[in-house]
Swiss-Prot record:
<dbReference type="InterPro" id="IPR008210">
    <property type="entry name" value="PEP_carboxykinase_N"/>
</dbReference>
<comment type="function">
    <text>Involved in the gluconeogenesis. Catalyzes the conversion of oxaloacetate (OAA) to phosphoenolpyruvate (PEP) through direct phosphoryl transfer between the nucleoside triphosphate and OAA.</text>
</comment>
<feature type="binding site">
    <location>
        <position position="456"/>
    </location>
    <ligand>
        <name>ATP</name>
    </ligand>
</feature>
<dbReference type="GO" id="GO:0004612">
    <property type="term" value="F:phosphoenolpyruvate carboxykinase (ATP) activity"/>
</dbReference>
<dbReference type="Pfam" id="PF01293">
    <property type="entry name" value="PEPCK_ATP"/>
</dbReference>
<feature type="binding site">
    <location>
        <position position="214"/>
    </location>
    <ligand>
        <name>Mn(2+)</name>
    </ligand>
</feature>
<keyword id="KW-0963">Cytoplasm</keyword>
<comment type="pathway">
    <text>Carbohydrate biosynthesis; gluconeogenesis.</text>
</comment>
<keyword id="KW-0210">Decarboxylase</keyword>
<feature type="binding site">
    <location>
        <begin position="249"/>
        <end position="257"/>
    </location>
    <ligand>
        <name>ATP</name>
    </ligand>
</feature>
<feature type="binding site">
    <location>
        <position position="298"/>
    </location>
    <ligand>
        <name>ATP</name>
    </ligand>
</feature>
<keyword id="KW-0312">Gluconeogenesis</keyword>
<keyword id="KW-0464">Manganese</keyword>
<feature type="binding site">
    <location>
        <position position="208"/>
    </location>
    <ligand>
        <name>substrate</name>
    </ligand>
</feature>
<keyword id="KW-0479">Metal-binding</keyword>
<dbReference type="GO" id="GO:0005524">
    <property type="term" value="F:ATP binding"/>
</dbReference>
<dbReference type="GO" id="GO:0005829">
    <property type="term" value="C:cytosol"/>
</dbReference>
Amino acid sequence: MTVMEHTKAASIDLTKHGLRNVKEVVRNPSYEMLFAEETRADLEGYEKGVVTELGAVAVDTGIFTGRSPKDKYIVKDATTEEHMWWTTPAVPNDNKPITQEVWNDLKQLVTNQLSGKRVFVIDGYCGANPDTRLSIRVITEVAWQAHFVKNMFIRPTEEELASFEPDFVVMNGAKCTNQKWKEHGLNSENFTVFNLTERMQLIGGTWYGGEMKKGMFAMMNYFLPLKGIASMHCSANMGKEGDVAIFFGLSGTGKTTLSTDPKRALIGDDEHGWDDDGVFNFEGGCYAKTIKLSKEAEPDIYNAIRRDALLENVTVRNDGSINFDDGSKTENTRVSYPIHHIENIVKPVSKGGHANKVIFLSADAFGVLPPVSKLTPEQTKYHFLSGFTAKLAGTERGITEPTPTFSACFGAAFLTLHPTKYAEVLVKRMEEAGAEAYLVNTGWNGSGKRISIQDTRGIIDAILDGSIEEAPTKHVPIFNLEVPTSLPGVDPTILDPRDTYVDPLQWESKAQDLAQRFINNFAKYTDNAEGQSLVAAGPQLD
């Protein structure tokens, strides 16, 4: 075996991970080498990258253009049995158990796939705080997957690599599938499986890069809260005075747009922890959606798409130009890039002090939630556990039916402990820091129109500069929320949602409908004392 070192670090032994007769190990290659490797003329199929006119390489991830939660499994053993939030028929989630025996078969499959090959090894960190980060090793035979990992995790220094020992190993065998899946009782021939005793993730059948990123997020979501550290699906930024704000929100609520603010430096756009020192990014890069991307609307992201960025599933024309409007392959077109491709970031390390503002973003398509409400600690836990947003289904003009989504902690797909654990740790951190929480509706109101981005930005500014604290408030019934009656730069007629309806009874009827959905959804958290105690903080129907 030869080890092609692109660092001064000592060579590595992959036999301890189960690999045999590896032809060559390419460890932590430079971006230049990855560019050459992923665009080689002899590559075929999903391995081959195409150079675009922006300088970034574009790849196709095959039939999987998003994560495959139905193919996610975790070994149930002495390590995980007690703390893991296992799926149940009553409250299904993505944490499905498998036995050690099934794991052994899948590990054999993946190690057979990677043995005897030339492999790329990327060593990096998940977590910007050295005390609590996970040292991650990813092994793959596909150059662009190594590139994705280099972009998304925190890149070690030469010195750190010299003594690098992985806490967690990801073996990506995208080219192999499990023909015994029925015998194993699995969902399909594809798999992404975790063993927390062996501290390893195995991937087979899917080429989608996000499985590696979100896999490690799920692991941080397991290990950190058990140490009293908040693990959060949120964006974070910092003001000129060092004040930190965090933004929770599901897809389409404005998390990236509102945290990318010329007046504030970005800490990170997706995954963060909060420990005794403050808020820190888990990642060394960003993974942004590119569907309908334009330079005018999102200049920061557009300008980040250059050499070293990696595009996924976009349409590249013969001349190398990109059609960002084309969603024929998937609406989930993406780009990964190292965080330093964004100009206004917190440097040299993506971390800040304790957050003093926590913002829950919800796009309410029912049109009944206030544009902004200040939350009590109990309401903070309630709305964090609810993780509500709603989309308008249908593309016709006129009336469409709102579809509610409740995703615990604004990221249920990535939770590995019971949701109440995350709420408990977050609120404890907030109380220690004296942080305030706000629920911000970036969706609709009684006018039938979406709340304008100008008004929403005005609301966010009022939260961040503290002027919302000086505003007079009033009580909005049913949702049991306190709302300001005026804010600088915000249309005062929208602040009480009842005022946006010609007939206030129409608001009441819709509000009761949504309140009942909140109540029905929250019932699943009342299986413990913590959840039961929060019911009074949510919507109330007489």
